[in-house]
Swiss-Prot record:
Any one of the GO BP annotations: response to UV
Location of the region described as Disordered in the Swiss-Prot/TrEMBL record: 411-437, 476-495, 528-552, 607-698
InterPro entries: G-protein_beta_WD-40_rep, WD-repeat_CDT2_adapter, WD40/YVTN_repeat-like_dom_sf, WD40_repeat_CS, WD40_repeat_dom_sf, WD40_rpt
Protein's name in the database: Denticleless protein homolog
Gene Ontology terms: cellular component: centrosome; chromosome; Cul4A-RING E3 ubiquitin ligase complex; Cul4B-RING E3 ubiquitin ligase complex; cytoplasm; nucleus
Subunit structure: Component of the DCX(DTL) E3 ubiquitin ligase complex, at least composed of CUL4 (CUL4A or CUL4B), DDB1, DTL/CDT2 and RBX1.
Organism encoding this protein: Gallus gallus
Pathway: Protein modification; protein ubiquitination
């Protein structure tokens, strides 16, 4: 009978030990009495940064919370009266307290602050026991070993890890580090060995290194000889042997073991939290790529054995904690919630603690009581979640009004899409109408990981709309009253010849219909005479021939005032000053008179347009020479505006129907012997003499234009 009773008792013990606890997670609630506001010196709300439960005997229910203004408060989670809820509070530092740790089994606590110091406090006596000084930047993490009460470690933004021993004597009233790991998580410098040697000699000295970009974010003591650390940028979890004096060596410290980043992100490589289970065999590393990696510390393999996902980690304030029975993992998140996973089944959807309105940062699971979880949030509150069991009718009627937090189940599809979901602080993607032919960019590739924490959001900007706007901006306005045939279609750039490119001036659109008048011709009246002129048979040209010319002005006054006096088909340029054009060869027969008549002012041209019988003024120069043709030739010192502005021969608007320019020059020389220049007159000067200039910005339409060689489009420099 005794043996049978023992067997039944053993079987019952096995059944009770294997009883799943996951169904109990849905019972966590946070009532209004457990929602506490974190405030500073003047009573203003400030965010809490760290929280931790005590492990001292008869003190396990005490929760220590540190906030941004350096205050530390002790909350009695078992107090029935709200007046006795805060057992003690004091301002530990004049700067923010980023982390705190209880001395194992003692009523002492160590705070790590932004004032570059760590302080040891006796919480019962309320006195300061010592100050640890040695860091050059803010302290981000502090940790004790479970087997040591006097030895602890700190990590800071200066990239250094320091080990402290409170049993050592104080120097100048401060505790000094007994071991130091400088540049523990420095990124490998890609400089030459000589530069590295000089840099190391300059920076390596008595003072620790300072590197804000290679901060030590978290430190952890596995035992009295093993330290684990992680950084902000290198993506490597390093294990250090404290029996080695790293301060005695001047070269970069080498860890005894390293766990390299196992994910696929290219820039989110930092770790915000490291947690060991009660056995010290499993390490949980909270990474900023929205994943928690589980490593086996007893194995020689360095890749993770499990990955927990579903939350969001966008800052280095997100912490994790393990349940007392090592079955569950809880973590804060940037999406205003806390998440609970089952360690043995990481693929299952996690439970969600819902209730905070801002990022949930530090979190602590009471090591002596499975039913209590503490969370800190950027909404300036500290909440204590308790495991409660109420009937369904009580949940919905009486207790829901008193609750500020509860547990929900994350859906499997939400967990799969958690990596692709954006942070609440990010701008959501724009939704476009169905059926719109748009291309969104960028998009993750098919081979991309399920999460995209390092990928930018897709803009969903319709590409077609952008192209349409660009095309609209480049298309000139249509002429009112113009017929469709007067506005030819645009010629594709792939089909355009060199004549099309020469015809296009900078910052101008292709020739479509009527061109806008030049800004220099602001006084000219824009009329519809161009359309009438272009419709006549005399002005009909092919599109290629029109594009072979430069842009011409097309006002009514231009056409009336620019007609050649010799009734030829010459064409002049738009602006003789800017383009330095010459008179057409047809003016050579008439001599310089045509140039003089064309050098009238704009008012004279307008008067000439109004009164066709008006005769142009003849310009005379003192000391001018009269050639046999009867025209006056100004001296070389005092030349007409036409000859001053003309430097090179303009062959672009010449017509093949006229004489050859050599024969015209010869005839000029034969008839102008009386006014011939000196014998030193060079051939280039002769070409300059034969050159003619446009005298008016007015233009006329050429009636016949033939294809010309490309060499004629380039001006020839005069030889002085």
């Amino acid at each position: 009978m005794l043996c049978r009773a023992l067997l039944l008792r053993a079987a019952g013990h096995r059944q009770s030990s294997s009883l799943p606890l996951q169904h109990l997670l849905d019972g966590y609630r946070c009532s209004r009495e457990d929602d506490h506001l974190s405030y500073g010196e003047i009573g203003m709300p400030v965010p809490p940064f760290g929280c931790s439960f005590s492990a001292a005997p008869n003190f396990e229910h005490v929760l220590a919370v540190a906030n941004e203004e350096g205050f530390v408060r002790l909350y009695d989670t078992e107090a029935q009266n709200t007046t006795k809820l805060i057992s003690k509070e004091w301002q530990a530092h004049s700067n923010a307290v980023f982390d705190l740790a209880w001395v194992p089994g003692e009523h002492r606590i160590v705070t790590a602050s932004g004032d570059q110091t760590a302080k040891v406090w006796d919480v019962r006596a309320g006195e300061l026991l010592g100050i640890c000084k040695g860091h050059q930047c803010s302290l981000k993490s502090v940790a004790f070993s479970r087997f040591e009460k006097a030895v602890f470690c700190t990590g800071g933004r200066d990239g250094n890890i320091m080990v402290w021993d409170t049993r050592c004597n104080k120097k100048d009233g401060f505790y000094r580090q007994v071991n130091q790991i400088s540049g523990a998580h420095n990124v490998v410098d890609r400089q030459t060995p000589s530069k590295l040697r000089k840099k190391r000699q300059n920076l390596r000295g008595l003072a620790p290194l300072v590197d804000f970009q290679q901060s030590v974010t978290v430190v952890l003591l596995q035992d009295e000889h093993t330290l684990i650390s992680a950084g902000a940028v290198d993506g490597v979890i390093k294990v250090w042997d404290l029996r080695k004096n790293y301060a005695a060596y001047r070269q970069d410290p080498v860890p005894s073991k390293s766990f390299f980043y196992p994910g696929t992100s290219t820039r989110k490589l930092g770790y915000s939290s490291l947690v060991l289970d009660s056995t010290g065999a499993n390490l949980f590393a909270n990474c900023t790529d929205d994943s928690i990696y589980m490593f086996n510390m007893t194995s020689l393999k360095t890749f993770p054995v499990a990955v927990f996902s579903g939350h969001q980690n966008s800052t280095f304030y997100i912490k994790s904690s393990i349940s007392p029975d090592d079955q569950f993992l809880v973590s804060g998140s940037s999406d205003c919630n806390a998440y609970i996973w089952k360690v043995s089944e990481p693929s299952l959807p996690p439970r969600i603690l819902v209730g905070h309105s801002q990022e949930v940062t530090s979190i602590a699971w009471c090591p002596s009581d499975f039913t209590k979880i503490a969370t800190c949030s950027d909404d300036n509150t500290v909440r204590i979640w308790r495991l409660q069991h109420y009937p369904e009718e009580e949940k919905s009627v009486s207790n829901k009004a008193k609750l500020v937090g509860w547990v929900t189940q994350k859906k499997p599809e939400e967990q799969r899409g958690a990596g692709r979901s954006a942070s609440p602080q990010s701008t959501p993607a724009k939704a476009f109408s169905v059926g719109s032919p748009c291309a969104s960019s960028p998009r993750p590739a098919a081979c991309a990981p399920s999460y995209s924490g390092d990928l930018p959001l897709s803009t969903n900007t319709p590409t077609v709309s952008l192209k349409t706007q660009m095309a609209t901006a480049c298309t000139p306005a249509k002429l009112s009253g113009a017929s469709p045939r007067t506005s030819p279609k645009l010629v594709p750039s792939s089909k355009m010849s060199i004549k099309h490119w020469i015809a296009r001036t900078p910052c101008s659109s292709p020739e479509v219909g009527k061109k806008t008048p030049s800004p220099r011709k602001a006084l000219a009246e824009v009329t519809q005479s161009l359309l009438e002129t272009s419709s006549t048979p005399k002005a009909q040209h092919s599109q290629a021939e029109k594009r072979a010319k430069r842009r011409l002005d097309c006002s009514k006054e231009d056409e009336a005032g620019q007609k050649c006096l010799q009734d030829c088909s010459c064409v002049t340029e738009l602006d003789h000053v800017a383009k330095k054009s010459k008179l057409n060869l047809c003016h050579l027969a008439a001599g310089q008179r045509a140039c003089d008549e064309g050098s009238l002012s704009l008012a004279d041209l307008d008067n000439e347009h109004e009164d066709s019988t008006h005769s142009p003024k003849e310009l005379s120069f003192p000391g001018s020479l009269v050639n046999p043709s009867g025209t006056q030739t100004p001296p070389p010192v005092l030349q007409s505006p036409c000859e001053r502005d003309s430097d090179v021969v303009d062959k672009e608007n010449s017509s093949p129907e006229r004489k050859n320019w050599l024969s015209a020059l010869g005839e000029k020389l034969r008839t102008g012997k009386a006014g011939s220049p000196p014998s030193s007159y060079t051939s280039s000067a002769k070409r300059q003499e034969a050159a003619v200039v446009t005298t008016s910005p007015k233009t006329a339409v050429n009636t016949s234009v033939s294809m010309r060689k490309i060499c004629t489009y380039f001006h020839r420099k005069p030889q002085n």
